[in-house]
């Protein structure tokens, strides 16, 4: 009975109703338009790849786009699209159909697939182009592209140039093999170099009318199928090695457990190989007779792919982060995706100009990678939403080096960034004054200028949400420390445009009275920096802050007393 309940639960969870939470909130017209556009894009990619050997998009983005199309078709019941291999169909029938392969999403899926299976083998999933090879009396006479799995195109014209492919067997036998033509690489580490467009390069070469000897020698062969070979995998591999295909045996490992599969997947992902790979293939050692094979995924073979180097992510929102100096940085908030075990929810575009050039809107699908294995990076827009949602962006001249010294409409982000810098390690180095604290004080109306916080007491601090009596006492201690900070540290906290190692001697009056020429006499200060310094000290907002600090008794800002001559 518990098994029946579990089956019923799994069935319910797989229904469209259960999946609805992840489905877009589109009306029927929009859903139809979005699906039609995605289908058209995929059809164009298929046509270029299968007919011209041109990959218009990275393989992993192609795969994820197909997954998205399948998901949308389930969400909105708009029917299914033609097979992506339809445009690959050719006139030449395969002696035995090429089976497909189911992709296992994670360790749990692999564990389920392996349950009850014995005699399982693991191989690298070579990232190339699948073919059928026909040998007669030991000589390679026919090379056929996978096509739709049943019919493909005749690539036999390339056989004379494929110097790295076994064209003459040591025995005069007739046999039919299936395998992968791949781009030969030296010491290729998939985890570091990625796919290197290896599959697309080989597809492009094979689509040509003629190859040069050098081009043909760049292509290798990995045999993974011998439909009419020995019944057991171990014997098939041994005979293939004797026939001139040693790599099949070298890169095939018998395994017993999920941990074995995970070990070899990780090993091949991070080891130097002569070809690009995009995962591992799991297959049972025994399989049905070749006469029963069909061009669809069978139960006895599956793929466990590597983590994506690029993730296809849906843009949920576009927000604009304003920094202390007025620099506007657009940030894309995306539906969470995973890259190398990192959960990505947002990615910076770097500049307002780049966002304007790319014109990214909510609903767009973008490619994201990791720069330096840690920082999310936008690669490009993959799909644009049919309906373009309006975005209100800051005007290019709204924020600059001397805007938003006070809290006002449209200024909160830059003003809080100024306060964060002031209290941070580059400024006064005040404990317990991070951006969250400043935001609470600003939103509570307790801090509206750069110096208001100097006048706060414990009672008023506790008016801000999340600030307890103890926290208020600790914050007051930090604020009191600020009063004794040196004059030059205060200037740097306010953002004076000068290098951290250059000296700032004197007081406010002396520095504010310097001309650009006088600033340039300081080693390390050129014409541009001197103009910025003059503008900083001359800004009315900065002068007002200096006056407030003088009134608060901060050293260096106070006007020195006049000496009276007797």
UniProtKB/Swiss-Prot annotation:
One of its GO terms (molecular function) is DNA ligase (NAD+) activity. It comes from Pseudomonas putida (strain ATCC 47054 / DSM 6125 / CFBP 8728 / NCIMB 11950 / KT2440). This is DNA ligase B. PROSITE patterns: DNA_LIGASE_N2 (PS01056). Its EC number is 6.5.1.2. The active site is at 125 (n6-amp-lysine intermediate). SMART domains: LIGANc. Catalyzes the formation of phosphodiester linkages between 5'-phosphoryl and 3'-hydroxyl groups in double-stranded DNA using NAD as a coenzyme and as the energy source for the reaction. It catalyses: NAD(+) + (deoxyribonucleotide)n-3'-hydroxyl + 5'-phospho-(deoxyribonucleotide)m = (deoxyribonucleotide)n+m + AMP + beta-nicotinamide D-nucleotide. Keywords: DNA damage, DNA repair, DNA replication, Ligase, NAD. Belongs to the NAD-dependent DNA ligase family. LigB subfamily. One of its GO terms (biological process) is DNA repair. The keyword Ribosomal protein does not apply. It comes from the Bacteria. It is an enzyme of class 6 (ligase). It holds the Pfam family DNA_ligase_OB. The keyword DNA repair applies.
